[in-house]
Amino acid sequence: MSNMLEKARKYETEKIAATDPQTKPLFHVSAPTGWINDPNGFSFYDGQIHLFYQYHPYNREWGPMHWGHSVTCDMIQWEQLPAALAPDEEYDKAGCFSGSAIEADGKHVLVYTGVTRIKQPDGSEQDRQNQCIAFGLSLIHI
């Protein structure tokens, strides 16, 4: 696991412990902390329904996208799992954007858009999107 993903998971744990459960919705997925947007990777794996989503754990405003992760068996009660992806590689250091999830050869596989920023000759920056894949129990990048 990368340092950035480990840092995000530690931050989530701290924020969950400090959050009054009564402030969280009963029947909807919500991020443990920070900003949440685009749902991704809605999938069935290992007997559970998984929902991944883009989110920025460190602020309630848009920022470098991570992928949050929740599971359910009944589509009513959702369990928050640790972050699945963090922008921690050269090919996704500006964010882990939209993607999908499948089961392949018994593994949960995430395919997502990694974003990098490329400096242009005039000094401006341009986003470059890359197709990325993560797989396995801890969703290790390849």
Question: Could you describe each region identified by the protein language model?
Answer:
Residues 68-72, 129-138:
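Beta-propeller blade signature
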Residues 140-142:
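Conserved small/polar residues in nucleotide/adenosyl-binding loops
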Residues 1-50, 55:
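N-terminal regions that are enriched for targeting/export leaders
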Residues 45-47, 73-76:
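Short, ordered coil/turn segments that flank beta-strands lining enzyme active or ligand-binding pockets
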Residues 62-69, 75-104:
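Blade-loop segments of beta-propeller domains
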Residues 33-34, 60-63:
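Short loop/turn motifs at secondary-structure junctions and domain boundaries
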Residues 38-58, 81-83, 98-124, 130-135:
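Hydrophobic core segments of beta-strands in well-ordered, beta-rich domains
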Residues 18, 31, 58, 90-91, ...:
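Residues embedded in well-ordered secondary-structure elements
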